[in-house]
UniProtKB/Swiss-Prot annotation:
It holds the Pfam family UPRTase. One of its GO terms (biological process) is uracil salvage. Its cofactor is Mg(2+). Belongs to the UPRTase family. This is Uracil phosphoribosyltransferase. It comes from Variovorax paradoxus (strain S110). 5-phospho-alpha-D-ribose 1-diphosphate binds at residues 79, 104, 131-139, 200. Gene3D superfamilies: 3.40.50.2020. Keywords: Allosteric enzyme, Glycosyltransferase, GTP-binding, Magnesium, Nucleotide-binding, Transferase. Catalyzes the conversion of uracil and 5-phospho-alpha-D-ribose 1-diphosphate (PRPP) to UMP and diphosphate.
Amino acid sequence: MSNVHLVDHPLVQHKLTLMRRKDASTNSFRRLLNEISMLMAYEVTRDMPMQDIEVETPLETMQAKVIDGKKLVLVSILRAGTGILDGMLTVVPGARVGHIGLYRDPKTLTAVEYYFKMPGEMENRDVIVVDPMLATGNSAVAAVERLKELNPKSIKFVCLLTCPEGLATMQKAHPDVPVYTAAIDRELNSHGYILPGLGDAGDRIFGTK
């Protein structure tokens, strides 16, 4: 699929396999997600704009590169997006943070918004939306649609797992938004869960049921 980037680095795939195991503890699951998120941050930010500035080293003055423009914004889809957000902030500590609160209606599987908070000057910022699972795609589509109302410079979507159904939904609604994922699993089940998947990411991150 166009505009879909599979992050197949061996370290990412190894850690993802460990996360999939049903006997992985909450602590292990959370730690592994943090580590994968740091590795994925490297991939998703590789085309960020740069500018030259003058830097004085201990030996001489030189021209060196820094990231150009307003601070990047990482947008977490609550609640599970927090798991990816923490790892990415380790790599990009200067990023601004936004939150979108969405829950999935268990009957219709549609996304319902209950919270929305973003930094200022969004029209001058690049945005990375994070959520561990791109399953039905409804939450991702709703989040991106809401963000587009603020006219950011660009939007990317990062997830741990997705499936053909979720990707199709996302690409139909937002073909201009690149999706970065560690795996494309087989399918959705009738309850909207990815198969073979890794279960409910939010429950496994926070130790809830």
